[in-house]
Amino acid sequence: MSLRVPQEELSGLRSRNLNELAAQIDWSDSAAGFLTERATFETVLQSVINHDLWFDALSLLAHALAPRQSIWWAYSVCCQWYEVGHATKDDTATSLLDLTRTWVIEPDDETRLKLHDLALAIPNRSPAHWIGMSVFWSTGNITPDAGVVTAPPPYLYARGVSACIDLAASLAGLSRQEVYLGALAAGIDLAGGGEGRVTFQGKAQI
């Protein structure tokens, strides 16, 4: 299975500035070689996908999407991971996913803080943990109990999104390539203004 990145500008991205994005990403040495003077966001994304540099591709797309889009992408992949990976979704994970959907549609700080508490109650080897952390890191104060206001570092949420999807690929019990390609296809669809439906082995999940 191959994946083609549209070479026209993807209209749904928050940023296509490779210099800005590249400064935030821990690139592999192989991926860094594609950051040439004439490169575009789309050509670099296509190159890292063609060379199976999956985490580089996830990171680039997670950073380029707007925070709510990026988190919705991780949420959609995680929902599909539970469906096809036969993982047990306990009450805490169910609550976290339901609340994430609510937050993406209508974000507010109370929900963000609840999602942080739920994330801390889930092991960090679960993709769901990183969705909750991504929401917490996307905006607001990340030291609410310290008596000071600390804004999250720019793009910190994108690291949580990348971790979520990478873990889903590792733990799904399917071909990792199948999961990466399905997730990236959904992310590219979101970046192009689509709904970002995730499909693994012919199954779909909103």
Annotate each language-model stretch with its function.
Residues M1-N124, F136, G140-I206:
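Short, glycine-biased loop/turn motifs at secondary-structure junctions and
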